[in-house]
């Protein structure tokens, strides 16, 4: 067909999966992105939106299922925006993620020989998330609902028991819902900016069993809070109950003001032997089982013997820094978010670690300044940047400092490939690469790479 229009129907075979988890199929050279499909599916689809050389379509029916297609466990898998790959066999998900890393390293990084180790998958790829944020709303019959947003929308898909989350979520949400109904608490409306209850944050320490609940409200205080606390304390492990004030017209979920209702205001958890204190506003990896494997790999790649000076850039609350400090002489952590550095310093104290020092600021500003003014030294540099990757000034300073090893932890293998190419062109050799599946059933994959100075 020379020109595709909305609602045109067609058949195609899915050949690949996009970065966002849509299946990719072609008809006469025209590329289609089709949600809820798996590589190998032959489907009938309906065009929803078309551009010059590609379009988006809705899968109408599966004509011939892929050998790697499975029945999703979750009843709302198709509507919910959280799991893009749940219809794909888990082993095939891992293969897809490995291929994604490999392809980015060859196409973007220009690497011809990639020393790639097998991806670290999960033995049990369900119930792995230690944190969930549930929005509240009303359905068409004016019943209170909570769950998750449908893909690319703010329409709530009712789901109190996400199979990626902890089993306690459902009981906690039922208590909160009953409390709202009992006392007639109004739900927040994004369009009118009226109503009180916005979200519920739930966190759990997997190794300690400690639970946290934080209600996000569009108001100064939470009515009938004593009754809510009394009910929530019936759940084993309940350690911290609070509310967060967020009166802004914003998509940001948490407000900066947190008022404590019960407990110490935080929960604790361990990654390996390191203890972490987690408040409602703390960043903490959501999959602690895989985080331990990811950081263990980073620590192994760092090759520490006890005498090294290590810089940990984009260090967050010091999760990798404290892991490294167990085996290094000195660790310096850098992070732009002041609250995260406060948490990092508290976590260092909590573990009695005196060989760690933290700086607040941008990695691309702190590292050059420390290098030029104070001639700081590094045997090993570890980076764990956001999705956009490392700033070029930061990479340039790493090259000037000349550490023996650079360990790169990445949540986006495309920007990883770009940055590895930059370092490889300036005296470093790619020695090892390994994927780690932190988010089963989604299209995301973490990667750890080791570069050594030639």
PLM region spans:
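Flexible loop/N-cap segments at domain edges
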Residues: 200
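Short, conserved phosphate/pyrophosphate- and ester-handling motifs at nucleotide-, phospho-/glycolipid
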Residues: 40, 165, 287
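Rossmann-like S-adenosyl-L-methionine
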Residues: 2-11, 19, 220, 224-235, ...
């Amino acid at each position: 067909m020379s020109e595709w229009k909305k609602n045109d129907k067609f058949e195609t075979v899915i050949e690949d999966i996009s970065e966002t988890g849509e299946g990719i199929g072609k008809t006469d050279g025209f590329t289609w992105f089709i949600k809820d499909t798996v590589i190998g599916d032959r489907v009938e689809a309906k065009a929803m939106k078309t551009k010059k050389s590609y379009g988006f379509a809705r899968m109408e029916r599966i004509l011939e299922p892929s050998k790697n297609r499975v029945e999703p466990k979750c009843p709302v898998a198709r509507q919910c925006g959280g799991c893009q790959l749940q219809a794909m066999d888990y082993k095939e998900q891992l293969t897809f993620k490995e291929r994604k890393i490999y392809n980015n390293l060859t196409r973007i990084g220009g690497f011809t020989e990639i020393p790639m180790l097998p991806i670290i998958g999960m033995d049990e790829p369900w119930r792995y998330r230690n944190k969930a944020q549930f929005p509240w709303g009303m359905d068409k019959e004016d019943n209170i609902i909570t769950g998750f947003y449908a893909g690319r929308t703010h329409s709530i898909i009712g789901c109190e028991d996400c199979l990626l989350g902890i089993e306690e979520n459902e009981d906690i949400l039922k208590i909160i819902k009953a409390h709202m109904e009992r006392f007639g608490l109004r739900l927040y409306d994004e369009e009118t900016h009226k109503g009180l209850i916005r979200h519920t944050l739930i966190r759990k320490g997997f190794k300690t069993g400690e639970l946290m609940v934080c209600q996000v409200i569009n108001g100064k205080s939470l009515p009938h809070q004593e009754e809510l606390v009394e009910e929530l304390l019936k759940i084993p492990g309940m350690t911290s109950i609070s509310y967060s004030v967020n009166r802004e017209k914003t998509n940001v979920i948490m407000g900066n003001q947190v008022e404590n209702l019960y407990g110490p205001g935080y929960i604790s958890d361990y990654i390996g032997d390191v203890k972490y204190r987690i408040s409602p506003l703390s960043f903490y990896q959501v999959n602690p089982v895989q985080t331990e494997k990811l950081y263990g790999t980073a620590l192994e790649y760092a090759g520490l013997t006890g005498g090294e000076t290590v810089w940990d850039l984009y260090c967050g609350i010091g999760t990798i820094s404290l892991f490294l400090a167990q085996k290094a002489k000195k660790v310096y952590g850098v992070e732009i978010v002041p609250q995260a550095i406060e948490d990092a310093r508290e976590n260092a104290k909590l573990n009695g670690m005196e060989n760690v020092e933290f700086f607040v600021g941008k990695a691309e500003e702190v590292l050059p300044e420390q290098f030029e003014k104070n001639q700081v030294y590094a045997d090993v540099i570890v980076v764990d940047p956001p999705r956009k990757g490392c700033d070029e000034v930061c990479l340039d300073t790493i090259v000037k400092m000349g550490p023996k090893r650079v360990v790169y932890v990445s949540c986006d293998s495309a920007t990883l490939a770009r940055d590895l190419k930059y370092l490889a062109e300036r005296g470093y050799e790619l020695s090892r690469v390994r994927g780690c599946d932190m988010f089963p059933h989604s299209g995301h994959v973490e990667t750890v790479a080791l570069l050594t100075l030639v």
